[in-house]
Amino acid sequence: MSAKINSKKLEMFDLLKKFIDNKQNLFFLDYRGLSVSQLTDLRNKIEGEHGALKVVKNNIMKMVLKEKNINIVDSCLVGPTVVVTALEEANVIAKIFYDFVKSSTLKVKGGFVLGEFYDEAKVQAYSKLPTKKESISLLASVLKAPVSKLARTLKALADIKN
């Protein structure tokens, strides 16, 4: 029976290892009090933005993180835990689960973003950053403003001469 348990744990270890392979962004959430349908809804929203959500066993996750040399605060792996990964824009994923926090019992424990541990407050601040698309739009409008002003000035000058 012991061999059966160990093989299951080893299989779970390998699955979690593959789950976080090549991921630079990990978030740890406490899903206590969420219904299955709420968790499924959260998972669908996260997957819609190129992220993934997995319910994990804390001890096995600790071993995986240790093997990957990822250092996080132990409190991130206490109680019911889901790990959320982001393939692209991690702050978009963070916005999704912070929107979810407002209407549910979901709690953010912390995260690991681009090689640095983020506590709950840092993850929340990170979630408020503009997305890549919003940043590009803002930059475009900033670059466009002087050109538009010059065009209006030249048009006004031409109107005065006529």
UniProtKB/Swiss-Prot annotation:
SUPFAM superfamilies: Ribosomal protein L10-like. GO terms for cellular component: large ribosomal subunit. The keyword Flavoprotein does not apply. One of its GO terms (molecular function) is structural constituent of ribosome. InterPro entries: Ribosomal_uL10, Ribosomal_uL10-like_sf, Ribosomal_uL10_bac, Ribosomal_uL10_bac_type, Ribosomal_uL10_CS_bac. GO terms for biological process: translation. Pfam families: Ribosomal_L10. Keywords: Ribonucleoprotein, Ribosomal protein, RNA-binding, rRNA-binding. PROSITE patterns: RIBOSOMAL_L10 (PS01109). The keyword Glycoprotein does not apply. Forms part of the ribosomal stalk, playing a central role in the interaction of the ribosome with GTP-bound translation factors. Belongs to the universal ribosomal protein uL10 family. Part of the ribosomal stalk of the 50S ribosomal subunit. The N-terminus interacts with L11 and the large rRNA to form the base of the stalk. The C-terminus forms an elongated spine to which L12 dimers bind in a sequential fashion forming a multimeric L10(L12)X complex. This is Large ribosomal subunit protein uL10. The gene is rplJ.
